Amino acid sequence: MAMQAAKRANIRLPPEVNRILYIRNLPYKITAEEMYDIFGKYGPIRQIRVGNTPETRGTAYVVYEDIFDAKNACDHLSGFNVCNRYLVVLYYNANRAFQKMDTKKKEEQLKLLKEKYGINTDPPK
């Protein structure tokens, strides 16, 4: 066990690898317990969040205790078939999650600047 930990300490992982996985294309009726059965085989899990609103159905977040377990799960479960659906397993990216929000904020700021300087972008009639 100590030998394995020493080997892991020497491995450099890509920067996008982290302990949080984002899973898409899940069956809508999947439960957290079923997620634990599938993802728990790759290491101890700290938390699982399954989407239950119309916007988040079919998605989930899985947080592993160890980054190497998350990498192993991502490598092995991408494309895994669950109820005739092939899972899409990605590393969580905080920047991507807030990208839509940033776009709306920028559009609002642009609108305010246009109003401030009297710029009209409507096409001429």
Curated annotation (Swiss-Prot):
Entry superkingdom: Eukaryota
Sequence ranges assigned to domain RRM in this UniProt record: 19-94
Keywords of this entry: Acetylation, Isopeptide bond, mRNA processing, mRNA splicing, Nucleus, RNA-binding, Spliceosome, Ubl conjugation
Record-listed N6-acetyllysine modification sites: K29, K41
GO molecular function, one term: RNA binding
Gene3D superfamilies, alphabetized: 3.30.70.330
Record CDD domains: RRM_SF3B14 (cd12241)
GO biological process: blastocyst formation; mRNA splicing, via spliceosome; U2-type prespliceosome assembly
Region (Interaction with pre-mRNA branch site) residue spans: 16-29
Family statement drawn from the similarity comment of this UniProt entry: Belongs to the SF3B6 family.
Protein name: Splicing factor 3B subunit 6
